[in-house]
Amino acid sequence: VNAVESYLRKRAIAAPWRLECGPIEGVECAVVIPALAERAGILGTLRSLAANPRAELARALVVVVVNNRAPGVARAEDIAGNQETLDLLRGLMRDGGAAEGRDVMEAGLRLACIDASSSGFELPAKGGVGLARRIGLDAALRVLHQAGAGEAAVLLSTDADTLVEPNYLEAVRRHYARPEAWAACVDYAHRLDGADAEVAAVLAYETHLRCHVLGLRLANSPYAYATVGSTIVCSARAYAAAGGMNRRQAGEDFYFLQQLAKTGRVEAIHATTVHPAPRASHRVPFGTGRWVQDRLDGRQELVTYHPEGYRVLGALLSLVHERPDAAPEWILAELARASRPAAEFLERQEFAECWNKLRQNSPNLRVFLAQFHRWFDAFKTLKLLHGLRDSGFPLQPLWSAVRTLLEQAEQEPPAFPWQTLAGDREAQTALLRHLRQLERQKTR
């Protein structure tokens, strides 16, 4: 029994949700899209997928998970909208659908859907996008296994407000032509169209995300990637090894990527880009939509982590990599010279006990470092940054923090108008494009 078969037997979610689809012969990958109140936008996402070559579409099953919680928890208008989405999808699958969506099916899109919306099929009260993704990915994994795709099958996660490029499926397939390919994040770039206030907010949000990744890279963290749910790709084997998609209402992408990084390697796919929408949303407690909404409501300042926090993180990781033979007390004492709060944080995490145990149980340096980063994972990294935020390195204005990190990376754009950046949308856009390009260069 391989890892995928074991996962499907022991951990995969099934009842009461059922995959509605046509023939599955020849399917090698699946694109899973959770959809909540997306009747107006889902066709745009499906059309962007349908613009991929017919030969690529023949290998791919597109699974839309129409989901909401029960009445009284979910909004009545969202439930009604979801029923319209289900009607649309079922019509497309049955006979090509209404005129507005017929082009999608004529292009060769292989469509499937899951009803996690109707009475008796709703998500539980604490369910959310994480569970919706899990339901879809588990169902897709089962279909891929039945189709004979095996552990090399590929699972792609995106969103119903996200547009993909015409080479999306090909770029992912080419990446997974390498047998060792485990997990990856496709390049992303939020669309900078729409209402001015929303565009301004998403400009700042994506800059914050890329600022954070730049700081993590400067610190040499193995968790230096953006956690954007619409970008995640993994092999069937990796999905099973990671224990499936995290079920959280938000942050599911963060925890799932962390597990993928602990069990293998998270790479970058630069050959194509996905384009999330710059829209506000109340549906999740954090993430792009919530950040944009809070910014519009005046509850979100333009701030990000203090650059010194990444310097302290880098000091810790340097000590670990340069002196793996050292006693934990020496590591803590040296770290305290850079930041006493960081050393105290590690003490609260029982660092000394963990360090000694890792040294005893690791046969070589490679295993030791891998085990250390499984312990000091993305979540502990974030907890350290939050601890430093609360003990001497408070959140900093976004634009000045970006400048500091770019200076440290020796990647500051030439002759850039930093002094007037806060009120200059054109310059902010240019800065974001610079950060996007820098991220591509650093992960090639």
Where on the chain are the PLM-derived regions?
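Conserved donor NDP-sugar-binding/catalytic core segment of glycosyltransferases
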Residues: 163-203
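Acidic donor-binding/catalytic loop of UDP-sugar-dependent glycosyltransferases
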Residues: 138, 150-175
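Active-site-proximal specificity loops/subdomain of glycosyltransferases
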Residues: 8-10, 71-152
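A recurrent flexible, glycine/aromatic-enriched loop bordering the glycosyltransferase active site
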Residues: 213-233
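Terminal low-complexity segments of carbohydrate-biosynthetic enzymes
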Residues: 1-6, 293-444
